[in-house]
Every structure is written in structure tokens, then in C-alpha cells.
Amino acid sequence: MSTTTNKKPIRVYVDGCFDLMHFGHANALRQARELGDILVVGVHTDEEIAKNKGPPVMNEQERYKAVRACKWADEVAEGAPYTLTEEYLDSLNCDFCVHGEDISVGADGKDVYEGIKKSGKFRFIKRTEGVSTTELVGRMLLCTKDHLQNVSGEQTSPLGGVNPNVLHKQSPYTSLSHFLPTTRKIVQFSEGRSPKPNDKIIYMDGGFDLFHVGHTEALKQARALGDYLIVGVHDDRVVHEQKGSNFPIMNLHERVLSVLSCRYVDEVVIGAPFSVTKDMIDSLHINVVVHGDDQVVLGPEGGVDPYKLPRELGIYKEVKHTEGLTATEIVKRIIDNRLQYEARNRKKEAKEINFIEQSN
């Protein structure tokens, strides 16, 4: 007789702000999910974040939706407390809490997981090097985007006069670092499911920079049109040619991992061509090509419509933009509140350094 048939599922809890939800967050959820059967994700309110850390870039409703779109999140606990208690963990029927190696300090300067650690219901997971919300805000504030310099040969930043020393590099958790892409990470994020012979295959492409709820809602609609969703992610040069200025904020590998973490996505074409070609349609067995209902940006070579062929074949469809959010809008939020976010990053780092010094 098997002893596993009536085994109680292990419920794992992880919490956070999940501001500017990125592949580092997704990787934490992936690792946490591997430790049990059901992953419950607690997301803090705007008020809690402002009190303990500084103002979030994305509001709580946007952050709740972003977490729900991650394929490793089974349940979302909205309005989770910033300082976790054993009572709250028990109220969710969770067996233990998981957090990265980086420290999390509350408004009082104390470790927010201190009580849970003492209770023995705490597990560590590895932090994803080279990406954090603070780091992404730093890129937008200081334009420390090596990948963009390589694409365009120059920086064209509206914040070109910002002092690069505004964000210090002393805390190991709040430094500007570099994500090193590996094939293993792509495999870990990939679904690994192949389309079935009779599956209706949907294709949607784009830059997917600063992957946000506007993207996930569009992908959800696209996936509903068929059985298998393939997403084409444009390379850095294509995104820069179309968006100009400081885009993309995130490089190709970072954007690919963000898209792969989405529960509506089955497969990703890395560095997809700007125009949808006959070869692509034939080789990927595409039945429907999807784009948002915003204006299609024409290609640089004589103003070519990238969806000309799908339109002619009668396989082109549009989905509604329901969120009204773009990467440009997110960057604008940062720039409009630049001083607030610079202060937030400094405050966060200062608390971390102080905590490290007191712990040593």
C-alpha cells in the first residue's frame, strides 16, 4: 500500500512587494514552488510598502495581477503583512515560509522574518543575481544599461545629468550588478510542452520590456484564442529602432525569462524577426497571429507593415489593451518621481548596511 496517496499537500508561503515584477521574482517563486505542492504568495499593500520601504512604482492591484500571472503562483494572499507572524502563516494553512538570502528590514530596522526564523518555519532559497526592483529603478534613473550602449553606441538619457554616485554600491543586496544568462536558466523557466497535432497555435510578438500587467493581460487574451501560445520576443536592436530613447531597459535574455514565467505562454522565439514571414508561419504551424489594438509600428525599411502577410492570409487578429500600461508609462512614473525613488533606494540600502553591521 502506497504511503503517498493520502499525503497532505505541503503548502509553501512566500511574500514580497513584487514591484516591477521581474524574472528574479519569478525565479524565487519557481524555487519556492519546488519545495512543496502548493505555493501561496503574499503581496503587501501600497501603504505597507510606503511605510517600510518607500513608495512602490506599481500599485497594489497591478502587483496582485502580476503575481497571479506567474505560472508558479497557485494562490495569492492580497494585503499580506510586511512583518510575517506565525499566526498569519497558520491562517493560510502554510507549513513554512521561504525567502531569498537577501535581508528584508522593516521600518523599525529589524529583520521582518525574525519571529518565523525562531519558530523553525523558515527556509532559504538562492537569490537571482543581477536583477532586483531597486536595480531596475536604478537603470531607469541612471541609465546604467550596457546592453543599450552596445546597441546604439551612445546614451541618450533624459537623465543624463544624474550623478551616478547617487546610488552607492556598498550593500550586497542593493547594488547595480549584471545578470548572466545561462541555458540552464532558460530550461528551468521553459514549460517543456510541445503542441499536439490538432492544437490551434497562436503567435504574438513584441518587445515585452519591463514585463507588466498590460503584457500579461494581452497574452491571456491571445492564449484564449487557441490551444498553444508562441511568443516572439524581439532583440534589443529591433526594440531600440522602434522605441528609441533609452529602450530597451531590459536586455533580450531578461525579457525572454520574464515572458517564459507567464502562465499563458507555452513557447518563446528568442530574437524573433520584426516582420512575420511565411517561413515562420510554416515552420511554427501558426494558425493565428495576434497583436494589440494599438497602432502598429511600421518597419524602418520603407515603412513595412510587419503583419502584412498574416493580414493577407486572413489569420491576423487584434486583442484589446485593457490595462492602459506601457513600458514608457512605467519609465515616466520613475522620472516624474525621481527624487522619491532615489531617496527610497538610498534609504533601503542604508537600512541593509546598518543591519549587516549590527549583525556582525
From Swiss-Prot:
**Any single GO CC term annotated in Swiss-Prot or TrEMBL for this entry:** phagocytic vesicle
Q: Which reaction does it catalyse?
A: phosphoethanolamine + CTP + H(+) = CDP-ethanolamine + diphosphate
Pathway assigned in UniProt: Phospholipid metabolism; phosphatidylethanolamine biosynthesis; phosphatidylethanolamine from ethanolamine: step 2/3
Coiled coil regions in record: none
Q: Which domain of life is it from?
A: Eukaryota
- Quick one: a GO biological-process term for this protein? phosphatidylethanolamine biosynthetic process
List of residues binding CTP: 207-208, 215-218, 243, 291-294, 321-325
- Which EC class does it fall in? transferase
Q: Which UniProt keywords apply?
A: Lipid biosynthesis, Lipid metabolism, Nucleotidyltransferase, Phospholipid biosynthesis, Phospholipid metabolism, Transferase
Q: What is its EC number?
A: 2.7.7.14
Q: Listed GO molecular functions?
A: ethanolamine-phosphate cytidylyltransferase activity
Return any one Pfam family short name. CTP_transf_like
Q: What does this protein do?
A: Ethanolamine-phosphate cytidylyltransferase that catalyzes the second step in the synthesis of phosphatidylethanolamine (PE) from ethanolamine via the CDP-ethanolamine pathway.
The Swiss-Prot or TrEMBL record describes its family as follows: Belongs to the cytidylyltransferase family.
The protein depicted here goes by the name Ethanolamine-phosphate cytidylyltransferase
- Tell me which species this is from: Dictyostelium discoideum (Social amoeba)
Q: What is the lineage of its organism?
A: Eukaryota, Amoebozoa, Evosea, Eumycetozoa, Dictyostelia
